[in-house]
Amino acid sequence: MIHASPVRLAAVVVLGGAVALATSACGGPMQAGAAAVVQGQRTTDATVQDQVSSIISLVQKNNLQQGDVTDAQRAALGKAQISLLVEQALWQRAADDEGLEVTSADDAKEQSALVEQDRATLGGKQFTGSDNEAVALADAESQSASGLAPSTVPIYAHVQALIRAVVNEQAAKAHLDPNDQNNVPALQSALQPVLVKAAGEIKVKISPRYGQFDASTAQVVAAQASWIRPTKAQIAAAQQQQDASNGMGTN
């Protein structure tokens, strides 16, 4: 079944509201055709629609969705694509403020762990898709699904690597073991000012089509109805692309 919730964290610490903090830095008119502009990087409506189409195609191909995809599901998937970009900007800024560097090797290590974990999860189904599709499908099956599209798995892995670096840095400063559940409250307290500072520094604009801002909670509230309606042709095209990718053995 298609569903999406805020991006899961690789670290043991889960910060409720970490995503929401980033949405406070916004304003100004949207560029034509833009779904979001995050730190000056423009993501188009077409890109988001393609990502949503690829998720729908993946879950339908693997019989996870019964019946038609609802407006609420489409809205959640569209918002999830934007939320991932905001997450990336927030944690990248936090890492930069702390003087931390996350390398491509760190990203590769994180993605490799995700692929190994998620392929094991799908093992009983003898999943033959690409590594990125395996991660996206395992995400779709989980109770904490974040609405990952196969094409955004590398971004997701980078976000996890950023989170891990920032959490470990704050844990070291506070002389805390980040893997000890008893330290979660203390780590949350240590991370809060870091994320608040980062949230005030990033620049985020989101199209009202994907929701609206609640100033009282600094959260993006999803639109009640979704304008994202992938056509059968778009879903079929996404299916063909996935099949072609599987045939070539690519991610």
Show the residue positions of the predicted features:
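Short, low-structural-confidence N-terminal segments
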Residues: 1-73, 189-251
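Alpha-helical transmembrane segments of integral membrane proteins
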Residues: 8-11, 79, 155
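A broadly tuned, weak detector of single residues within folded domains
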Residues: 19, 33, 88, 154-155, ...
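N-terminal targeting/tethering segments
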Residues: 29-142
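Well-structured core secondary-structure elements of compact alpha/beta domains
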Residues: 50-77, 152-185
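Short, mixed-charge aromatic SLiMs
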Residues: 106-123, 181-206
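Proteostasis/folding factors centered on peptidyl-prolyl cis-trans isomerases
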Residues: 126-174, 179, 192, 205-209, ...
